[in-house]
UniProtKB/Swiss-Prot annotation:
Protein name: Pantothenate synthetase
GO biological process: pantothenate biosynthetic process
The species this protein was found in: Polynucleobacter necessarius subsp. necessarius (strain STIR1)
Record function comment: Catalyzes the condensation of pantoate with beta-alanine in an ATP-dependent reaction via a pantoyl-adenylate intermediate.
Broadest EC class assigned to this enzyme: ligase
Similarity-based family: Belongs to the pantothenate synthetase family.
GO cellular component: cytosol
InterPro entries xrefs: Cyt_trans-like, Pantoate_ligase, Pantoate_ligase_C, Rossmann-like_a/b/a_fold
Pfam family, one: Pantoate_ligase
Catalytic residues (UniProt): 33 (proton donor)
Length: 283
């Protein structure tokens, strides 16, 4: 596996080859990331992965400085997966001048849910992803469904900018007890880790209530959301949101859309101690 930090060197290595299958990451790799590498390979070699902890998507009180950086362990894992190139730029490589131009997703998608609680997050994500796409020029790029809203925003960005890349969704990988794998799970204490699977259990209960009730009105949807928030809050969680939304655009479903049976997704973000976890479940 070649490890490259310079943009021009990366382009030189990729010139004359089939366009790559690309998986962007922030490192601290786990089985969820590795499953995306395998999915990328199904869409063709060479597979290019990137590791870059992107300052632009962290807020002033978030964990940029403490975000786990495990480069050597990540290299070992990527080599075992047969990744052709690891693109690991420094901040100076990717942002040689201050990044004055940003990609700002539309408010109706970028300022809701995660965007409401992490202002500027998706602007930072879209900016770095567009820049990485420019560097790698991939044929396909794989993003995990665990970051459901991010996946949708990247897909829409690629479509609206007519980027010649297909966005491929990868399924969420979970621990045996159901907790979605995440680099931030390492922040959990032993007691918190034992409690953490209650998040996906709550989403499954929400899904079952929706299915059992054959819900067709927005008021009942709101009541189910409030019940789930109260249930987790009673266990010590601090909820940012539990929201039942349309899969197509993450907007709240109208009565007419509910009656038409439009596909829904449940999304959540919640803090357990100091650790903020996100998850989702399609209905």
């Amino acid at each position: 596996m070649k490890i490259i930090s310079d943009i021009q060197e990366l382009r030189d290595h990729l010139r004359g080859q089939n366009r790559a299958s690309f998986v962007p990451t922030m490192g601290n790799l786990h089985e969820g990331h590795l499953s995306l590498m395998r999915l990328a390979r199904q869409h063709g070699d060479p597979v290019v992965a990137s590791i870059f902890v992107n300052r632009l998507q962290f807020g002033p009180n978030e964990d940029f400085d403490s975000y786990p950086r495990t480069m050597q362990a990540d290299i070992d894992k990527l080599e075992k997966e047969g990744v052709y190139i690891l693109f690991a730029p420094t901040e100076r490589d990717l942002y040689p001048q201050p990044q004055e131009y940003r990609v700002d997703p539309p408010q109706q998608l970028g300022d809701i849910l995660e965007g409401e609680f992490r202002p500027g997050f998706f602007k930072g994500v879209c900016t770095v992803v567009l820049k990485l796409f420019s560097c790698v020029q991939p044929k396909v790029a794989v993003f995990g469904k665990k970051d459901y809203q991010q996946l949708m925003i990247i897909h829409q960005m690629a479509k609206q900018f007519a980027l010649p890349v297909e966005i491929i969704p990868g399924e969420t990988i979970r621990a045996e007890d159901g907790l979605a794998l995440s680099s931030r799970n390492g922040y959990l204490s032993a007691e918190e880790r034992a409690e953490a699977p209650e998040l996906i259990k709550a989403l499954k209960e929400v899904r079952q209530r929706v299915l059992d009730s054959n819900i067709r009105d927005a008021k009942t949807i709101s009541e189910i959301e409030k019940l789930a928030v109260a249930s987790l809050a009673g266990r010590g969680w601090k909820l940012d949101y539990i929201a039942i939304r349309q899969q197509s655009n993450l907007a709240p479903a109208s009565n007419e859309q509910l009656q038409a049976g439009d596909p829904l997704v449940i999304l959540t973000a919640a803090k357990l101690g100091k650790t903020r976890l996100i998850d989702n479940l399609e209905i």
